[in-house]
Amino acid sequence: EDTLEQASKLVKTNPQGLVEKLEHLMAEMKALQSENESLKSKAAKEALGDVMDQVEEVKGTKLLAVRADGVDMNGLRDLGDQLKEKLGEGVIVLASECDGRVNLVAMATDAAMKSGAHAGNLIKAIAKTVGGGGGGRPNMAQAGGKNPAGIADALAQAKSALEEQLK
């Protein structure tokens, strides 16, 4: 009962209204987290600017491999989806240093997969460079790592790894 009183005072309500107040606070927290994710994704997109000039061609397949620091895994996936739409057909590899850790996401379009691209195998090949591991499906994969210093090498390796995959 004493704990109930303390909890009620903490959230500025009476014990009878505690559950309702907590439900309200939880909903508010969820909405703020969602808004935060959205803003992170938007900030990452703006920080990257127009990256389409960094698109390379590997055996006739477009490859966009870029770094977007400060973006968490969800943000990278969202950003990847947006870039995939812009790219049209090809492979996208995104890397981010976030809270001292590395996040990697790879995505391949249908045409790229028909040519032999496999996001899961691609991410496995480059994740070791950042001291991590990962995997996924042919069209989307992700990995984490502990060595941000390896990001540039991992992105460079994406090109050779993709070259090996393509027919």
Language-model region placement:
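Terminal appendage regions of diverse proteins
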Residues: 1-167
